Amino acid sequence: MPAIVLIGAQWGDEGKGKATDLLGGRLQWVVRYQGGNNAGHTVVLPNGDKFALHLIPSGILTPGVTNVIGNGVVVDPGVLLTELAGLDERGVDTSRLLLSADAHLIMPYHVAIDKVTERFLGAKKIGTTGRGIGPCYQDKLARVGVRVQDVLDEKILTQKVEAALEFKNQVLVKIYNRKALDPQQVVDEVLEQADGFKHRIADTRLQLNEALERGETVLLEGSQGTLLDVDHGTYPYVTSSNPTSGGAAVGSGIGPTKITTVLGILKAYTTRVGSGPFPTELFDQNGEYLAKTGGEVGVTTGRARRTGWFDAVIARYATRVNGITDYFLTKLDVLSSLDTIPICVGYDVDGVRYDEMPMSQTDVHHAKPIYEEMPGWWEDISHARTFEELPKNAQNYVLRLEELSGAYISCIGVGPGRDETIVRRDVVR
């Protein structure tokens, strides 16, 4: 059976949790392959229960599914334990969660440096969540990071923390005028936290590949979105990892030839949290309508999301860089009760038309959207379960997005619930 990659095709917050939850009953494994607790998935169960997950894969809510925090993820031990406790309190079985021995740990000094750096930059800040994600990935690439497996050997953990703080404390004290961190205190804190997750540490790359060899289905769940990818996103206003489909193989240990489907998640309009270019951003009553009707508040940050019309330029770009085979279009219901719905089909940059993503980020900043208008609809579509049950104008809107994006729209979300979905084509194949 296949490995399926699920990836956001915009700037994150597209509704990936809903897609994972919908597929959950057909899956045996769900894997987070990058990022950390700087992203959030919201899942609404058929009984109305709502779960906001930041680190643990969405498959944890589906009985019988084994969930993996992969080697490409950076893990805050405290956040992991808090999230597990919250799920346990609500009766969710968390026994089938595994943690890659090679995932990196977010240490207290990563969080401290992240927060003071953003304050130091002031108006020039990137807009990070301040959770230590970037500094942890920096240490990973500099080969001075602390990995999950290090908590199994106190001597190695102590050596790594002491070596790291020789430099980090200089930065905190001499540049940012903050107090130095005590190495032993950091070690003791991490070891105490490790008591709550040591039993979950595993060679997950081996287990995942063996699962595929047995014919089981594995979903590789990305966080954030394509335009936040450190290589392919709107740099420097990006995350510190690779949410794109190429990152799925690296962050899980599954070879790329074992991935048969790349499911992109597209919101029927566009949103973004934090700083950075956003060509279709709205500052009028339409933007307010999308934000209010769509409930556009960041799951992790609590920050209001910026809103705009659908951008086909970035959708085509996402299709290309991810090799997307299918799309799940979410929040189509939010667009009900609009007379007309603009779609951005290209950019105008200083009088030059771009139908594809400009190479220069300066051009992306200066891009003005070129719109094509589609007639809207006023009907309530939340009860539609087949494509034909949608109003004709809603059908035409979906088909136009499909044409512009360059991949088949296999699923359509018409409400927040798991069952409020239209399936046009099975993505597990």
UniProtKB/Swiss-Prot annotation:
Gene assigned in the entry: purA
Classification via NCBIfam families: PRK01117.1, purA
Any one GO cellular component localisation term in the record: cytoplasm
Cofactor comment: Binds 1 Mg(2+) ion per subunit.
SMART domains from the UniProt entry: Adenylsucc_synt
Catalytic reaction(s) noted: IMP + L-aspartate + GTP = N(6)-(1,2-dicarboxyethyl)-AMP + GDP + phosphate + 2 H(+)
Stated role: Plays an important role in the de novo pathway of purine nucleotide biosynthesis. Catalyzes the first committed step in the biosynthesis of AMP from IMP.
InterPro entries to which the protein is assigned, alphabetical: Adenylosuccin_syn_GTP-bd (IPR018220), Adenylosuccin_syn_Lys_AS (IPR033128), Adenylosuccinate_synth_dom1 (IPR042109), Adenylosuccinate_synth_dom2 (IPR042110), Adenylosuccinate_synth_dom3 (IPR042111), Adenylosuccinate_synthetase (IPR001114), P-loop_NTPase (IPR027417)
Descriptive protein name: Adenylosuccinate synthetase
Annotated compartments: Cytoplasm
List of residues binding substrate: 299-305
Functional pathway: Purine metabolism; AMP biosynthesis via de novo pathway; AMP from IMP: step 1/2
Subunit architecture: Homodimer.
MF-aspect GO terms: adenylosuccinate synthase activity; GTP binding; magnesium ion binding
Pfam families registered for this protein in UniProt: Adenylsucc_synt
Residue numbers binding IMP: 13-16, 38-41, 129, 143, 224, 239, 303
UniProt organism field: Rhodococcus jostii (strain RHA1)
Cystine bridges: none
PANTHER family: ADENYLOSUCCINATE SYNTHETASE
